[in-house]
Amino acid sequence: PIDMERPFPHIKSIFYLPAYIGRRQDKEAMEALYCPAGEITESSSSSFFMVIDGKIVTAPTERVLDGVMRQIVIKLAREAGLAVEMRCPLLSEVPRSQEAFITGSIKEILPVRRIGSQRISQVNGPISQYLQHLYAQRIEDYLE
């Protein structure tokens, strides 16, 4: 985790220096998480979601890049009746989270195994799997 927020979160940027530095500190990390003051906003090139007490928690739109895949996942979750809470998940909530995942156009919906040294209790848990299924179904329906 990096204790900073992207300066202009609504703009897709190629300024990856802070994320590069963060990944150098943890060679096993696939992405760096932006965590200003302990609030998880997004990762270096993906949107971030955490499942806490059965609710999907993700940063409010005004704090992050509102990517296409992020919008799709939020819409699919709400259409399926899943609770989506628009607030920044906290680093302090990681130990009690059930799942976490990142999204992106290429990554689609990718489970998170750990945040820093803290392991996520369920890697590719039921909510992540359900959203992956809903997304695959939406693509299949579109192609028919």
Model regions and ranges:
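Helix-start/capping segments and mature chain N-termini
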Residues: P1-E144
